[in-house]
Amino acid sequence: MTAYHTSKVDRKSMRRYRLERIRRQLRQRDYGGALLFDPANIRHATDVANMQVWALHNKCRYVYVPTEGPVILFDYGCAKHLSEGYELLEQTRTAFPHTYFTNGPRHGEYLENWAKEVADLVRQHGGGNKRLAVDKLDPPATHALERLGVVVTDGDELMEWARTIKNADEVVAIREAIAGCEAGIEAMWRALKPGMTENELWAHLHATNIARGGEWIECRLLTSGERTNPWFQECSDRVIQAGDIVAFDTDLIGPNGYCADISRTWVAGDVKPTGEQQRLYGVALDNLHHNLALVKAGLSFREFTEKSFPLPEEFVARRYSCLMHGVGLADEYPF
């Protein structure tokens, strides 16, 4: 249990499993370790959360995971206390800022000091293997490591594969995230009425997610009426009218940091859907049921693609970007 919500997840078991998944990928690729900046990857490796959205665009946190040896979290300057009690962490250090945002004109000087600390870890705990998987790193930082003999390799591929297969604890976490998301969807459904704006309706999902221990919502995909097509227009102050289709995609990061990615469409007001609305909804349902029936263990991506729902030509130009995608701490591979 964290300070934020109660959960049935066995956190210690989940942490052990996720860390071993990373190390299995490191061994398979003959890497000496990984250096992770992506907040979702840090969460997967350590379970420690700290201002994750801010950290998406500020490299203020990172974790070093050797194939064998101590896991060391580098956290934001005054936030080392946040990792207390996380049993898989051998050590928490203050992160060494190495971006222009934090260091200004002295950026190069601080960058070299950061690289020396990382290279020292590789020498101490890499067992002679200087291949380091890094998920997100600017070119100057990459070059600084390479000058010190570190061989920078692809950490994104490694982490996507590490995150592909969930254990029973993660399944519980995903179900809890879905339950929270469904509660938010119900809150939106109850609140929906003609005359409110898209933003006002969307706020009910955010409020419910936070109240139930959720974390954030990745996109703003709720539109109504003519704004539903083409898709990917963002939520706005448009006033919803009676009879409008209201469409949304939750992209919600819920309790335990797990994603619930649910799409729904409704008709606003006490209005019977038009024949065209019913036709479109029927095609969407046929698509879902057809593709879901294909999913089974051992199915290849190619077989799934070849047998997937034959989309009518009228929808091809504005079809979605993928048939299905993985999900976990975010949208994940395969996509």
Segments from the language model and where they lie:
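Active-site neighborhoods and metal-handling regions in enzymes and metal-associated proteins
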Residues: 1-335
